[in-house]
Every structure is written in C-alpha cells, then in structure tokens.
C-alpha cells in the first residue's frame, strides 16, 4: 500500500524536483536570497534537495542598503550557521548618485537599486538561471508567470511569449545571453508557507512576530523607525506623531517602503490562526505595489524579480 502524500509534502516534492532539474540543466545557477520567509523556505528546500551535500550553487542578495537591520543580522547568522556561499551586490551607480526611497521615490529607488542591481549581478557572474521565492497567490502578474520564466538578453520578461509547462516537464533550453528566473514556490500559498515553517522548524526574521515597535503612519501605512536615516526625512510634526504599537510584518522589503500591520501574533501558531482569518493581501503594505509609475508587471518586463 502506498502512503498518500499530504498537501505540504506534495508541494515540497514538487519544489525539490524543480530545484534539482535546474541544477542538472543549467551551467551556472544562483539562488536569490531576500532574507524573507519565502526565501527561508526555498533555501530549506534546496538544502533538503542536496542533503547531505552542500548546495551546488551560491546564494545572492541584491542589497539596496535599506533593509531592516534585523534582516542583515539574520542573513549573516544564517550564512555562518549553514556554511553558505553568499554573494552580495549593491548597485555602485546607485550609491554614487545617493539613490534613496525618500529623495527619489519608491519607483526610481526600486528600479535602480533592485532591478538594475539584479541585472548587473547576473551579468557580472554570468548566471543563466536564478531561483526566486515568488508565489502565484501574491500578486496578479505573478499568477500568470510560469515556473520557468524566460528572460531575453536584457533580462526582460514577455508575458505573451511564455512556454507551455505540462505537468512536471520543463523546457530549459535558452540561447546564448538568455536566462531564466525559476520559481519553485509558485504553487504555494502564504498559509502553506507558514504551516511549513512551523512543521519544519525553519528560522525566520523576528520582524514577522508581533512586538512593540516605533512606527509612524504615512499615507495610511505604518512605517517602522528602523534607524536614524528616516528621521532626517521627517518634519518636526511627523516626528511628534511617532508612536509605539504592537505590530508585525507579513512581508519584508526596504523598510521605508514596507508597512507593518497591527497584530497580536507572537508565535507561529498565532500567525497561522491569523492567516486563516485574514481577508487582505500580504503585500498590502508594500509601497512599490501601489506605485502609480508602474505596475508589478511593468517592473517585471524591465527585469524585476
């Protein structure tokens, strides 16, 4: 008698299969590591896929220099504990221009420090495949993206020119200069991610758990006061509105562009219970998703994750 796989075990098996396929098919793959919960699950699956050996590819963090301080600490801790080969890349042109989310806005900051930074890093190291932790339930443009997302020589995505994917058969053929972005977590939901983290004991950034934190409400979004730089861009009236609230983050990005949510969820079981009851998108707090200068699909067409 064959035991039936649970829902999460089926997702796990599918993701591990995808990761192994890419490692076998491509010459120089890399795993993008954004330090968030999805990256944590994807990294855990990759380590399972090749256990007891080490990962046959490096992990890479495209650093905007505006992540939460706890994210940087967590990244360095994981790299040391897991013995990972970490590549970090910061767009030197963006640094020279002093690009930041306050002065230049979310759209320009994201394009230069994230999109252009990623393209620079992929070109510099000659990677022909890059794993990402995006899921189809996150956002509508991601919902129609294939597991193997093909990019042209300029890293652009054409949603009208995607290859069919039948069952678990993936076509990895690319021409010179082309590459793919691979999304092993495509069929996972936010609830799946949290349940898997709970069952597997996967470490995550403490920012996901509710705690008293200093925040300021800007345009309906609770922005955390993570370091002194944000204070330079607040008026005296805004500084007077800084308060402490019990909040957590459902998604993590650049801290001035990532909103917190009020919550009492201090444990993984609390978070799972919250997920069962919530009716709002996890990306409601991501400022770039509401940027009038361009939709997520437009950003992906230009080479975004």
Swiss-Prot record:
Entry-linked InterPro entries: PAPS_reduct_dom (IPR002500), Rossmann-like_a/b/a_fold (IPR014729), SO4_adenylTrfase_ssu (IPR011784), Sulfate_adenylyltrnsfr_sub2 (IPR050128)
One GO-annotated biological process of the protein: hydrogen sulfide biosynthetic process
Recorded superkingdom: Bacteria
Pfam families with a match to the protein in the record: PAPS_reduct
GO molecular function, one term: sulfate adenylyltransferase (ATP) activity
Pathway where it operates: Sulfur metabolism; hydrogen sulfide biosynthesis; sulfite from sulfate: step 1/3
Keywords: ATP-binding, Nucleotide-binding, Nucleotidyltransferase, Transferase
EC number: 2.7.7.4
UniProt catalytic activity: sulfate + ATP + H(+) = adenosine 5'-phosphosulfate + diphosphate
PANTHER family from the UniProt entry: SULFATE ADENYLYLTRANSFERASE SUBUNIT 2 (PTHR43196:SF1)
Quaternary structure and interacting proteins, as annotated: Heterodimer composed of CysD, the smaller subunit, and CysN.
Family classification: Belongs to the PAPS reductase family. CysD subfamily.
NCBIfam families xrefs: CysD (TIGR02039), PRK05253.1 (NF003587), PRK12563.1 (NF009214)
UniProt xrefs under HAMAP family: Sulf_adenylyltr_sub2 (MF_00064)
Functional note: With CysN forms the ATP sulfurylase (ATPS) that catalyzes the adenylation of sulfate producing adenosine 5'-phosphosulfate (APS) and diphosphate, the first enzymatic step in sulfur assimilation pathway. APS synthesis involves the formation of a high-energy phosphoric-sulfuric acid anhydride bond driven by GTP hydrolysis by CysN coupled to ATP hydrolysis by CysD.
Name this polypeptide is given: Sulfate adenylyltransferase subunit 2
Organism of provenance: Pseudomonas putida (strain ATCC 47054 / DSM 6125 / CFBP 8728 / NCIMB 11950 / KT2440)
Upper taxonomic lineage: Bacteria, Pseudomonadati, Pseudomonadota, Gammaproteobacteria, Pseudomonadales
